[in-house]
């Protein structure tokens, strides 16, 4: 897509005002129609999110990382449109539109006449009381809600497109990820327990050497799909409906998953938040409904790998020039490493028992 294009009859050229000016404009209640009483702003390493009344607007930062590129206006527009389309698979009523931020005679506006200087995803604002992480924290999650979540996931995974990459490529990428996880987690600046990191890493590599065929079989039977890619409790709303938001739109390869890999990740997060029962119920019900689940050993590998990845992502915040709450991330990484170690011990036991494979 060219950087310059006609959009709603208006010329979209350069990015115009800087990010700070855009954020300042989008932080004001009078920017929106109708104007909310206040606008709450949240920053991530990829986006700014503006909560304005019953709507949420997401502005992508002009950043480039190894796994994504939002550095140009055209790339951000493509990412916004991909986010809309992909997330409508699991939350069709939440994702409303892609909205242009325009400039005319030096003034910014959402939509209207002018030169497009950026793009935003407009979403329905969900009731945070019903997000899965809040339900767990408040002791309000029920087995019936978990059952409804499983039903939604079953429908999604049955409709999801099978992955188009070869299992050998997938396993090679897994090994590269293990290398990266180990390298970051052994960085002496983070003071993480190196012996534990090595033990976890060894168990995962031994599994891939001895039992990688279990992953190949999931590809052979077309069980690996274009999934969500970031199935966390804070992305799941369980009010009158089940809405799952914030899939990984920016990198299709990161959405190539075994459904039970995603559920292993979600069960891990539920356990970390104090609801291990919910994660186990998710696994059991999904196994029953899809009728094609992996072995216990493969599910344990998925949990071990995801916990290690989350540990690495936690301390990776400290590579940023000005990380927020720097004291938090090593503690979070240790929590994930403890979960990974538990799964690694189970993997070691499985690997000693050929019949468990």
Task: Report each predicted region and the residues it spans.
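Cysteine-rich, disulfide-bonded extracellular modules and peptides in secreted proteins
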Residues: 3-27
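A composition/secondary-structure signal for short, hydrophobic, low-basic-content segments
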Residues: 1-4, 200
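Extended hydrophobic/Leu-rich segments
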Residues: 1, 99, 347-351
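Intrinsic disorder/low-complexity segments enriched in polar/small residues
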Residues: 5-6, 12, 270, 349, ...
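ATP/Mg2+ or Mg2+-diphosphate-binding catalytic cores
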Residues: 312-356
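Conserved ATP-binding subdomain of kinase catalytic cores across diverse folds
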Residues: 20-221, 226-228, 233-309
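Intrinsic-disorder-associated interaction segments
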Residues: 12-19, 171-174, 201, 326, ...
């Amino acid at each position: 897509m060219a950087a310059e294009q006609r959009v709603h009859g208006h010329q979209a050229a350069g990015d115009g005002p800087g990010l700070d000016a855009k954020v300042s404009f989008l932080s004001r209640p009078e920017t929106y129609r109708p104007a909310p009483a206040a606008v709450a702003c949240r920053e991530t390493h990829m986006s700014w999110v503006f909560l304005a009344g019953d709507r949420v607007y997401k502005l992508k930062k002009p950043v480039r990382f190894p796994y994504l590129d939002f550095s140009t206006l055209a790339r951000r527009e493509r990412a916004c449109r991909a986010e809309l389309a992909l997330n409508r698979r699991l939350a069709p009523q939440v994702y409303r539109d892609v909205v242009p931020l325009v400039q005319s005679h030096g003034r910014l506006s959402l939509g209207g006449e002018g030169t497009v200087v950026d793009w935003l995803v407009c979403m329905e604002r969900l009731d945070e009381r019903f997000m899965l992480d809040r339900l767990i924290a408040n002791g309000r999650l029920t087995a019936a809600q978990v059952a409804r979540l499983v039903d939604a996931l079953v429908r999604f995974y049955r409709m999801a497109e099978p992955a188009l990459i070869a299992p050998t490529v997938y396993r090679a990428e897994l090994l590269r990820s293990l290398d990266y996880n180990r390298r970051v987690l052994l960085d002496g600046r983070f003071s993480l327990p190196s012996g534990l990191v090595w033990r976890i890493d060894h168990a995962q590599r031994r599994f891939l050497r001895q039992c990688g065929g279990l992953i190949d079989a999931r590809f052979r039977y077309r069980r690996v799909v274009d999934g969500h890619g970031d199935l966390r409790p804070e992305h799941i709303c369980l009010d009158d409906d089940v809405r799952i938001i914030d899939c990984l739109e920016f990198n299709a390869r990161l959405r190539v998953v075994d459904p039970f890999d995603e559920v292993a990740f979600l069960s891990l997060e539920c356990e970390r938040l104090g609801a291990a029962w919910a994660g186990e119920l998710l696994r059991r019900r999904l196994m029953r409904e899809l009728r094609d689940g992996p072995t216990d050993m493969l599910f344990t590998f998925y949990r071990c790998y995801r916990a290690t990845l989350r540990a690495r992502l936690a301390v990776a915040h400290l590579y940023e020039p000005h990380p927020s709450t720097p004291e938090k991330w090593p503690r979070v990484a240790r929590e994930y490493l403890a979960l990974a170690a538990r799964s690694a011990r189970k993997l070691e036991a499985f690997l000693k028992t050929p019949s468990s494979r």
